[in-house]
Amino acid sequence: MQFTGKEDIEAPIERVFEEITDFQGFERSALRRGADVRRTDKLKVPGVGMSWHAAFKLRGKQRKVDVTVAEYDPPNGIKLGLMSPSIEGQMVAELVALSRGRTRMTVTLVLQPRTLAARLMMQSLRLARNNLTKRF
């Protein structure tokens, strides 16, 4: 299942890339919301191979996910791989400079079920696709 969203941002492409790759900020945000986030790589600078393990409660059930940076192309975009026991996927954020101070960001999320329960959940998502696409 695939979700895509586009947004034009009034900021230079370099600034937008800095914001979408503020990994420490995302870690702090997840921790404030009650998730347990651990960095699982030893890289000193941002790039391909960065990875995290996160555990959090969603809809009353404990969930776990591993996230890995699969592509890192400053300032054009980033690709993340997502792996959990029931779902795998990838998220791609592409940036295009429309002018010196304006950037178009396209985010694509592709999810694939790995278990029967995940297939049933994906079927529910397909039925609610229009509402989810509006929110995405």
Describe the role of every protein-language-model region.
Residues 13, 45, 71-75, 94-104:
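A short, structured loop/turn motif at beta-sheet edges
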Residues 2-4, 62-66, 87-92:
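Short, surface-exposed coil-to-beta transition loops
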Residues 9-11, 56-60, 71-73, 95, ...:
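Beta-strand elements of well-folded, non-transmembrane domains
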Residues 1-47:
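Hydrophobic ligand-binding cavity/cleft-lining segments
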Residues 12-18, 128, 132-135:
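Short amphipathic alpha-helical segments
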Residues 16-20, 26, 52, 69, ...:
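Hydrophobic pocket/interface hotspot
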Residues 38-84:
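Glycine-rich portal/gate segments that line the openings of hydrophobic small-molecule binding cavities
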Residues 79-134:
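Beta-strand/loop substructures that line and gate deep hydrophobic ligand-binding cavities in soluble
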